[in-house]
């Protein structure tokens, strides 16, 4: 051990083996016969004094003075008071050299050899000063022994730090590991290693052999730097040779995931363009039957979902299964009302598609007919997109329109025309996604291309010119309505809406519409081309549902979603449109009530016998 206690122990050993010096006449035995060689404690433990003696001989010029060579014929006065090797640097790894790196002849045992790769020039020169004492030294044996013990103690105290600077010392390696372990958490990464391979220990470069017998200051620095570089190289190489799987800690992983999620949301919103889920029940063929509604279903009339001139829609629950459904209650006022319901049931029995609402059951009572259908909780499409928390972009419109086209294509393949496509009849599957379904087949008709079909009903804003003129209709009639819906989703404006129904119908007949420059400024040319090929007076010039799905605007949604991160102005204008529509309905109701009140107060009804 390179400790102070070890140095003192070696010094004590030297005292026990030292013999009194010879007299002035030179009588004495040769050093190789009578006096055992002492271990070079100064060489092993470090320099004894840091002060440089200017009178010391130059070791480079005379590395091994003749007076220091140990020969059997050398008289006692010519050798120094304590036998020691001439130079510390003459000892190689194998103990070769003039002074001898191994134990001296007649020694008590092999002394401990401590490496000293970082000896400085001052230490080497001072070592020569301490060992090359002149032959004329007249100090007594006791004085030399005390001086030797003091030098050994001081060498032990100064030799230990020099030993710790060795790059191959376990103490310095442990110190380096502690330094790495004490680094702040911000500079290190907490890792869990799986399958770490063993790393070979760094090899000791060993003490360097100096040709001149001593190390200069520059040589000492270069040697120390080389040893430290070798140490760093070994530590650096071990990290490259280790094959491991780094797993960040839970906190770092969560933080990184949150950062990635925040960056993604800043770039674009993830759109769900998957098909909507099917109905919670398989498609079935429904027939109108009589029965007791209250025994099979629990009606919740307070939870109204909508209504119209045919009746109201509320939620209900099937008692036997607990399935939540939507119940459409239709009043039977005339025989024609029942015929319309039977036609609606016939149409819905043929529509088994994810984007089309499904029929579950139909029950007739004495005063009404109730259709039990799939419950869709998301609400109307327009009610959803006017929400302040919803960010509407052109890509959102693409996703909505594509699903509507899918539903229309299936209907047309089944020879069914909806004839009442409008925003109120497009429902969202939920309140957060982009999945929609088409509802309300009360005005739907079976279509035969070989037969003429005319209708005179619908919502004025979405009616096609052929319906207004009471001309023959076709599957292209629904495509006109799709063009109007798309126009409104992109701009928030109704292209044909007038101050009243008459003005609206006149705008439809003349196909008087245009792209508002300010509103459509951020809309792509592909979207405008899509709308222009639908809102055209000539039926044969309109795109079919299949052609719409093949249009460039409804394709490559993934690439367009990356480029489109704007919020369309239509979201703001649609809100104004809905407010105006509600105000108009309320105004009509109030006006009708006021007219009825005036007629009643004037006595006109009494004159008519009412």
From Swiss-Prot:
> What reaction does this enzyme carry out catalytically?
L-seryl-[myosin light chain] + ATP = O-phospho-L-seryl-[myosin light chain] + ADP + H(+); L-threonyl-[myosin light chain] + ATP = O-phospho-L-threonyl-[myosin light chain] + ADP + H(+)
Protein's recorded name: Myosin light chain kinase 2, skeletal/cardiac muscle
Q: Name one GO cellular component term.
A: dendrite
Question: What positions constitute the catalytic site?
Answer: 420 (proton acceptor)
Which positions fall inside the Protein kinase domain?
A: 299-554
Give this protein's Gene Ontology molecular function annotations: ATP binding; calmodulin binding; myosin light chain binding; myosin light chain kinase activity
- Phosphothreonine occurs at 459
């Amino acid at each position: 051990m390179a400790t102070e206690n070890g140095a003192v122990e070696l010094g004590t050993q030297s005292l026990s083996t030292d013999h009194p010096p010879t007299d002035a006449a030179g009588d004495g035995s040769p050093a190789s016969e009578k006096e055992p060689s002492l271990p070079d404690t100064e060489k092993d433990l470090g320099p004894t004094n840091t002060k440089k003696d200017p009178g010391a001989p130059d070791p480079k010029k005379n590395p091994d003075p003749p007076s220091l060579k140990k020969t059997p014929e050398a008289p006692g006065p010519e050798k120094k008071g304590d036998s020691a090797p001439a130079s510390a640097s003459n000892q190689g790894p194998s103990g070769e050299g003039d002074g001898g790196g191994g134990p001296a002849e007649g020694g008590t045992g092999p002394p401990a050899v401590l490496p000293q790769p970082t000896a400085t020039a001052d230490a080497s020169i001072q070592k020569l000063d301490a060992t090359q004492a002149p032959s004329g030294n007249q100090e007594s044996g006791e004085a030399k022994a005390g001086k030797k013990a003091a030098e050994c103690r001081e060498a032990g105290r100064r030799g230990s730090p020099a030993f710790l600077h060795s790059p191959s010392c376990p103490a310095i390696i442990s110190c380096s590991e502690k330094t790495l372990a004490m680094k702040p958490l911000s500079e290190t990464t907490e890792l869990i290693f799986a399958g770490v391979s063993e790393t070979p220990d760094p090899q000791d470069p060993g003490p360097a052999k100096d040709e001149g017998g001593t190390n200069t200051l520059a040589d000492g620095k270069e040697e120390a730097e080389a040893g430290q570089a070798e140490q760093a190289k070994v530590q650096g190489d071990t990290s490259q040779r280790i094959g491991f799987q780094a797993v960040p800690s839970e906190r770092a992983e969560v933080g990184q995931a949150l950062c990635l999620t925040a960056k993604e949301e800043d770039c674009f919103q993830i759109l769900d363009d998957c098909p909507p889920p099917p109905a919670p029940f398989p498609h079935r063929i429904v027939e109108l039957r009589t029965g007791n509604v209250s025994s099979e279903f629990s009606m919740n009339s307070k939870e109204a979902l909508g209504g119209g001139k045919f009746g109201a829609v509320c939620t209900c629950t099937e008692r036997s299964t607990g399935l939540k459904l939507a119940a459409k209650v239709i009043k039977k006022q005339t025989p024609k009302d029942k015929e319309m319901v039977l036609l609606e049931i016939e149409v819905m029995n043929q529509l088994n598609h994810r984007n089309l609402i499904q029929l579950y059951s139909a029950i007739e009572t004495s005063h009404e007919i109730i259709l039990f259908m799939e419950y869709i909780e998301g609400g109307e499409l327009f009610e959803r997109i006017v929400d302040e928390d919803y960010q509407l972009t052109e890509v959102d419109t693409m996703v909505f329109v594509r699903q509507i086209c899918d539903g229309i294509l299936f209907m047309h393949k089944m020879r069914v025309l909806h004839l009442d496509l409008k925003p109120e009849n497009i429902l969202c599957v939920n309140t957060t996604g982009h999945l929609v379904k088409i509802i309300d087949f009360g005005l739907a008709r079976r279509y035969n291309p070989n037969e003429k079909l005319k209708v005179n009903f619908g919502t004025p804003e979405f009616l096609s010119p052929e319906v207004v003129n009471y001309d023959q209709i076709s599957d292209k009639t629904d495509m006109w309505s799709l063009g109007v819906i798309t126009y409104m989703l992109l701009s928030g404006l109704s292209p044909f809406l007038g101050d009243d129904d008459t003005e609206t119908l006149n705008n439809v007949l003349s196909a008087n519409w245009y792209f508002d420059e300010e509103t459509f400024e951020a809309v792509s040319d592909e979207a405008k081309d899509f709308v222009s090929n639908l809102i055209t007076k000539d039926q044969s010039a309109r795109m079919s549902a299949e052609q719409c799905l093949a249009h460039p605007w409804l394709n490559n949604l993934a690439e367009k979603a990356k480029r489109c991160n704007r919020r369309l102005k239509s979201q703001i204008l649609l809100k104004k449109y809905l407010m105006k529509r509600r105000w108009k309905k309320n105004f009509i109701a109030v006006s009708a009530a006021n007219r009825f009140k005036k007629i009643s107060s004037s006595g006109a009804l009494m004159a008519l016998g009412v």
